[in-house]
């Protein structure tokens, strides 16, 4: 029978493969491998190399007490034999556990009264070095026994390190005090004058400004990983207006406030200055609050003072001259216990330098005259009439019109941005809460998701951003961005309402604020990164109105007031500098990350 063509090809492939295997000589290789394996497996024990072992010195351990002991041997009677003793032991254990829980709770509360800054210094672990002094003050304030055991270090080496840490922080605070003496209101004459007038200077060429920002570089003196200004995730950042002795201040989620003297050297002697390896940033971290630090600012006419606000309901004043921390104000729920705080979400100063505005986590507004003394021994209960209802949910941030002292804009978790007139206060119309008062609302902007922040510049432009991944710019300078023919916002009457679209007139809450441009921007920070917030430069020396916002791709973006990008700074940025700000007058930028580290561009 003749073979088919397919069978012939198969036979030819078999023959070709056999010839190829013969050429490779695989049989001889397998035989050699087998012989080597057999020789190794049957080799004599003497031919194998023995492993050298080094005898470890025998350490005689001292006989320690057993971890578990019989209650009978210890002389402790059972509950059945002596129920009174058992009840007493149980009561002592419960009391000890309750006291421990109370101390942990007190650590998260605000500070009571005034302190020297050296008492609030923290170590590298974030614990207060003089925690006993602070906790005793808190315990005595609430009427408990003020006996807190001091933490004892297990090794003398740790004691020495603590002493070195105290000396170093004390030296840095002395530097802060020396810098505070150099500040005066006259040093910031131009900023003060410009903050009270509405500048109308034209912007420079866009290309020229971009080239200027191209020259900004990361601060070269230290590695950004070595500039740790806070122990935990940064929630607020402040650049002091000084241009000669620069100070950067940051606050974190646990109430720590870090002060970085940018231009100061950490070494005193010439020998130490010559050794670059020993040079470290001049940073002191203070425990000023018990919860998130929401805002840090400096009064216009008192550059030696720094105001800090927190979710623990307190506002404190840090004096760089006296090296003290004083409680300016504490807010608590109207009619509630003193320890139920009304968290402060933001603070701002108006044209009247003695009055500060603040908003709360519950959507309320409050103003306080700093000339009114705050008595820590008396409970500062707010009446409902003292608070103005602006939103029914958290106010993430607000801004005051720098050209007036009665117009404010608020951004809220309820997905709205609103502009208010504080001159006209009546019964609240748009709140679901009963018996509330609110100022007159000019208008409202509805967003798809929550609005994180809003800021107001000298030329009556507003910027806001939120979780809808948009940066919105509003123009109320009387221009023709939207051809709405609105007068400049400073001329609006106390009952003025911008016109609404016909399709929206039936809605109770108007939607009559319209941005003239929207910029796409990723604001999805997630759980471990602070919320992105855009901020205007308050008094730009170059006359160009600009704002800064962090970029989720580990950088900083700077735009002008028309929405044109001026810079994208990302040199050596290893994390998202979510909380950022510009120097009030100079084109220096700083941003803080979730690990407490700072990136400075100059």
From Swiss-Prot:
Keywords, alphabetical: DNA damage, DNA-binding, Repeat, WD repeat
Protein name: DNA damage-binding protein CMR1
PROSITE patterns, per database record: WD_REPEATS_1, WD_REPEATS_2, WD_REPEATS_REGION
Listed InterPro entries: WD40/YVTN_repeat-like_dom_sf, WD40_repeat_CS, WD40_repeat_dom_sf, WD40_rpt, WD_repeat_DNA-damage-binding
WD repeat segments: 229-270, 291-328, 390-430, 446-484, 526-569, 571-602
Biased composition (Basic residues): 48-58
A GO BP annotation: regulation of DNA damage checkpoint
Family from the record: Belongs to the WD repeat DDB2/WDR76 family.
One GO MF term: DNA binding
Function: DNA-binding protein that binds to both single- and double-stranded DNA. Binds preferentially to UV-damaged DNA. May be involved in DNA-metabolic processes.
Region named Disordered: 35-85
GO cellular component, one term: nucleus
